[in-house]
Amino acid sequence: NEFKAACLTIAVITGTSASPSTKKLIAKLNETFENVAHVEYDAVSESAALDAFELMYGTRALPDYNLEKAEVIVSVGADFLGNWQGGGFEARYSKGRVPTNGKMSRHIQFESNMSLSGANADKRILVKPSEQNQTLIKLYQAIVNGNVSTEATPLNVAIQKAATQLKTAGSKAVVLTGIQDKNAQILALAINKALNSEVLEVSATKNIRKG
């Protein structure tokens, strides 16, 4: 009653919420006080991924990744077993890691700091933060053009091997990136498109982040 009498605006701050129950609760508050402002703020921004997906596919959302389908997973700075893009990927990842007929998914992680995903990878390649963008660029070049570089540095060799495995797996391969840069996110989507990846599900989008 005091709030109503004072005509003060009540600000309710939440993360991006796709939950019907949360939306109903906010609506009830608004009915009661009539001056509720609902502000959605994501502590971990996914603007780069949202911008990239919107540019390539016309929808501002995050795609889903069915890692159970993957034979080869290459991550460049994406802790997808942590809270990357809202999390929730570990169950289907785990299913793909169970040997079936002597086969299981292969996971290669390029990262600067140890992560849960890196700890579970078959191959973890340590890269500097400044090298992560170049790693994606070289992966794209290797998959589209067939080679990385004439200079056989340990990183270039690792990238070439990863690209070879991605191409061999084809539609059963996927590249993920946690680099907060629109161009890097576009590169990852372009690589998956070149691979005809079935793991990347562009029609099964998630609206769990707005920015």
Model-derived features: positions:
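Cofactor-pocket helix-loop regions in the catalytic cores of large enzyme subunits
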Residues: 1-211
